Amino acid sequence: MELELGLRLALPSPSPSPATATAAGSELDLLNSAPGSCRKRGFEEALGGFKTDDDNDDGNGRGGDGDSDGEMGNKRRKLVGWPPVKCLHRRRDGGCGGGYVKVKMEGLAIGRKLDLSILGSYAELLDTLHLMFPSTNQEDGHDRRRRHPYAVTYEDGEGDWMQVGDVPWEAFAKSVKRLKILV
Protein backbone atom coordinates (compact mmCIF):
# COMPACT_ATOMS: atom_id res chain seq x y z
CA MET A 1 0.00 0.00 0.00
CA GLU A 2 2.82 2.38 0.89
CA LEU A 3 4.57 1.77 -2.41
CA GLU A 4 1.43 2.21 -4.50
CA LEU A 5 0.70 5.66 -3.11
CA GLY A 6 4.30 6.85 -3.11
CA LEU A 7 4.14 7.85 0.54
CA ARG A 8 7.14 7.61 2.80
CA LEU A 9 8.56 9.38 5.81
CA ALA A 10 12.26 9.52 4.91
CA LEU A 11 13.80 12.36 2.92
CA PRO A 12 14.11 11.66 -0.78
CA SER A 13 17.33 10.03 -1.89
CA PRO A 14 19.22 10.96 -5.08
CA SER A 15 18.11 7.69 -6.67
CA PRO A 16 14.31 7.55 -6.46
CA SER A 17 12.61 4.26 -5.80
CA PRO A 18 10.36 2.78 -8.51
CA ALA A 19 7.28 3.83 -6.56
CA THR A 20 8.26 7.50 -6.58
CA ALA A 21 9.54 7.44 -10.14
CA THR A 22 5.96 7.78 -11.34
CA ALA A 23 5.53 11.10 -9.56
CA ALA A 24 5.50 14.26 -11.63
CA GLY A 25 8.83 15.94 -12.28
CA SER A 26 7.77 19.19 -10.65
CA GLU A 27 7.02 17.39 -7.40
CA LEU A 28 10.48 15.78 -7.42
CA ASP A 29 12.07 19.14 -8.08
CA LEU A 30 10.32 20.59 -5.06
CA LEU A 31 11.41 17.68 -2.88
CA ASN A 32 15.04 17.83 -4.02
CA SER A 33 15.34 21.62 -3.77
CA ALA A 34 17.38 23.25 -1.05
CA PRO A 35 15.62 24.19 2.18
CA GLY A 36 14.27 27.73 2.13
CA SER A 37 14.05 27.88 -1.66
CA CYS A 38 10.40 26.76 -1.71
CA ARG A 39 8.04 29.73 -1.70
CA LYS A 40 4.50 30.49 -2.66
CA ARG A 41 3.88 31.78 -6.12
CA GLY A 42 2.84 35.37 -6.58
CA PHE A 43 -0.37 36.46 -8.23
CA GLU A 44 1.30 37.08 -11.58
CA GLU A 45 3.08 33.71 -11.54
CA ALA A 46 -0.12 31.88 -10.64
CA LEU A 47 -2.01 33.46 -13.52
CA GLY A 48 0.78 32.66 -15.94
CA GLY A 49 1.02 36.10 -17.51
CA PHE A 50 -2.75 36.55 -17.79
CA LYS A 51 -3.49 40.28 -17.95
CA THR A 52 -6.66 41.53 -16.30
CA ASP A 53 -8.61 44.66 -17.17
CA ASP A 54 -7.73 46.35 -13.92
CA ASP A 55 -3.94 45.83 -14.05
CA ASN A 56 -3.52 49.55 -14.66
CA ASP A 57 -5.86 50.45 -11.84
CA ASP A 58 -4.39 53.03 -9.49
CA GLY A 59 -7.01 52.50 -6.79
CA ASN A 60 -9.14 55.55 -7.47
CA GLY A 61 -11.74 53.72 -9.55
CA ARG A 62 -10.89 55.51 -12.81
CA GLY A 63 -8.22 53.25 -14.23
CA GLY A 64 -4.46 53.58 -14.50
CA ASP A 65 -2.91 56.42 -16.41
CA GLY A 66 -4.49 59.18 -14.33
CA ASP A 67 -7.06 60.12 -16.97
CA SER A 68 -9.83 61.65 -14.94
CA ASP A 69 -12.10 62.64 -17.81
CA GLY A 70 -10.44 60.71 -20.60
CA GLU A 71 -11.33 57.48 -22.24
CA MET A 72 -11.96 55.56 -19.03
CA GLY A 73 -14.21 58.31 -17.65
CA ASN A 74 -16.51 58.04 -20.64
CA LYS A 75 -16.85 54.27 -20.47
CA ARG A 76 -19.78 53.06 -18.51
CA ARG A 77 -18.93 50.30 -16.08
CA LYS A 78 -21.27 47.36 -15.85
CA LEU A 79 -22.59 46.80 -12.35
CA VAL A 80 -22.71 43.21 -11.24
CA GLY A 81 -26.18 42.17 -10.13
CA TRP A 82 -27.93 45.20 -11.57
CA PRO A 83 -30.86 45.64 -11.60
CA PRO A 84 -31.58 43.96 -8.29
CA VAL A 85 -33.68 40.92 -9.09
CA LYS A 86 -35.94 41.28 -6.06
CA CYS A 87 -36.92 44.85 -6.99
CA LEU A 88 -37.38 43.87 -10.62
CA HIS A 89 -39.83 41.10 -9.67
CA ARG A 90 -41.72 43.48 -7.37
CA ARG A 91 -42.12 46.04 -10.12
CA ARG A 92 -43.17 43.39 -12.62
CA ASP A 93 -45.75 41.96 -10.25
CA GLY A 94 -47.11 45.41 -9.41
CA GLY A 95 -45.66 45.96 -5.95
CA CYS A 96 -45.26 43.71 -2.97
CA GLY A 97 -48.88 42.68 -3.25
CA GLY A 98 -48.96 41.04 0.15
CA GLY A 99 -46.03 38.68 0.33
CA TYR A 100 -44.51 37.32 3.51
CA VAL A 101 -43.97 39.78 6.35
CA LYS A 102 -42.25 39.32 9.68
CA VAL A 103 -44.43 39.37 12.77
CA LYS A 104 -42.97 39.97 16.22
CA MET A 105 -44.79 40.13 19.51
CA GLU A 106 -43.58 42.40 22.27
CA GLY A 107 -41.94 40.30 24.97
CA LEU A 108 -41.25 37.28 22.78
CA ALA A 109 -37.78 36.68 21.40
CA ILE A 110 -38.85 34.67 18.36
CA GLY A 111 -40.92 36.13 15.55
CA ARG A 112 -42.82 34.44 12.76
CA LYS A 113 -43.65 35.06 9.12
CA LEU A 114 -47.11 35.59 7.75
CA ASP A 115 -48.26 35.41 4.13
CA LEU A 116 -50.54 38.38 3.54
CA SER A 117 -51.53 37.17 0.08
CA ILE A 118 -53.85 34.54 1.58
CA LEU A 119 -55.63 37.12 3.74
CA GLY A 120 -58.29 39.47 2.43
CA SER A 121 -59.17 41.80 5.29
CA TYR A 122 -58.10 43.20 8.62
CA ALA A 123 -60.48 40.84 10.44
CA GLU A 124 -58.76 37.81 8.91
CA LEU A 125 -55.37 39.30 9.79
CA LEU A 126 -56.31 39.83 13.43
CA ASP A 127 -57.81 36.34 13.71
CA THR A 128 -54.67 34.81 12.21
CA LEU A 129 -52.45 36.79 14.58
CA HIS A 130 -54.60 35.65 17.50
CA LEU A 131 -54.07 32.03 16.43
CA MET A 132 -50.32 32.56 15.94
CA PHE A 133 -49.86 34.35 19.27
CA PRO A 134 -52.60 33.22 21.68
CA SER A 135 -53.28 35.64 24.51
CA THR A 136 -53.28 34.60 28.15
CA ASN A 137 -55.13 37.78 29.06
CA GLN A 138 -58.75 36.81 29.82
CA GLU A 139 -60.02 40.15 31.13
CA ASP A 140 -63.66 41.08 30.87
CA GLY A 141 -64.25 44.18 28.80
CA HIS A 142 -65.27 45.21 25.35
CA ASP A 143 -66.00 42.43 22.89
CA ARG A 144 -63.22 43.56 20.55
CA ARG A 145 -60.74 43.87 23.42
CA ARG A 146 -61.56 40.36 24.60
CA ARG A 147 -61.32 38.99 21.08
CA HIS A 148 -58.07 40.84 20.15
CA PRO A 149 -56.39 41.84 23.40
CA TYR A 150 -53.42 43.55 21.79
CA ALA A 151 -52.66 46.44 19.45
CA VAL A 152 -51.03 45.69 16.11
CA THR A 153 -48.71 48.15 14.39
CA TYR A 154 -46.89 47.90 11.09
CA GLU A 155 -43.92 49.49 9.36
CA ASP A 156 -44.72 50.85 5.93
CA GLY A 157 -42.42 51.31 2.95
CA GLU A 158 -41.20 54.69 4.19
CA GLY A 159 -40.19 53.32 7.59
CA ASP A 160 -43.07 54.86 9.56
CA TRP A 161 -44.85 52.81 12.22
CA MET A 162 -48.65 53.01 11.94
CA GLN A 163 -51.57 51.23 13.55
CA VAL A 164 -53.21 48.44 11.60
CA GLY A 165 -56.59 49.51 10.23
CA ASP A 166 -55.75 53.15 9.50
CA VAL A 167 -55.58 52.69 5.72
CA PRO A 168 -57.59 50.53 3.31
CA TRP A 169 -56.57 46.86 3.17
CA GLU A 170 -55.15 47.03 -0.38
CA ALA A 171 -52.87 49.95 0.48
CA PHE A 172 -51.83 48.21 3.69
CA ALA A 173 -51.02 44.94 1.92
CA LYS A 174 -48.82 46.73 -0.64
CA SER A 175 -46.92 48.92 1.82
CA VAL A 176 -46.40 46.73 4.89
CA LYS A 177 -42.85 45.57 5.64
CA ARG A 178 -43.31 44.04 9.09
CA LEU A 179 -45.83 43.76 11.90
CA LYS A 180 -45.36 44.31 15.61
CA ILE A 181 -47.86 43.21 18.25
CA LEU A 182 -48.00 45.41 21.34
CA VAL A 183 -49.43 43.87 24.49
UniProtKB/Swiss-Prot annotation:
Entry protein name: Auxin-responsive protein IAA20
SUPFAM superfamilies in the record: CAD & PB1 domains (SSF54277)
| A Pfam family of this chain | AUX_IAA
- Motif EAR-like (transcriptional repression), residue numbers: 3-7
User: What induces or represses expression of this protein, per its UniProt record?
Assistant: Highly induced by auxin.
Coiled coil stretches, renumbered: none
Q: In which tissues is it expressed?
A: Expressed at very low levels in etiolated seedlings and flowers.
Per the record, the major location class is: nucleus
Q: How does it assemble?
A: Homodimers and heterodimers.
Q: Which gene encodes it?
A: IAA20
Family to which the UniProt record says this protein belongs: Belongs to the Aux/IAA family.
Biological process, per Gene Ontology? auxin-activated signaling pathway; regulation of DNA-templated transcription; response to auxin
What PANTHER family does UniProt report for this protein, alphabetically? AUXIN-RESPONSIVE PROTEIN IAA17 (PTHR31734), AUXIN-RESPONSIVE PROTEIN IAA29 (PTHR31734:SF38)
Start and end of every PB1 domain?
Answer: 98-183
| Annotated spans, Disordered | 1-23, 42-77
- Quote the subcellular location field of this record: Nucleus
Return the Gene3D superfamilies for the record: Phosphatidylinositol 3-kinase Catalytic Subunit, Chain A, domain 1 (3.10.20.90)
Native source species: Oryza sativa subsp. japonica (Rice)
Q: Which GO terms describe its cellular component?
A: nucleus
Role, per record = Aux/IAA proteins are short-lived transcriptional factors that function as repressors of early auxin response genes at low auxin concentrations.
Q: Which domain of life is it from?
A: Eukaryota
Q: Which UniProt keywords apply?
A: Auxin signaling pathway, Nucleus, Repressor, Transcription, Transcription regulation
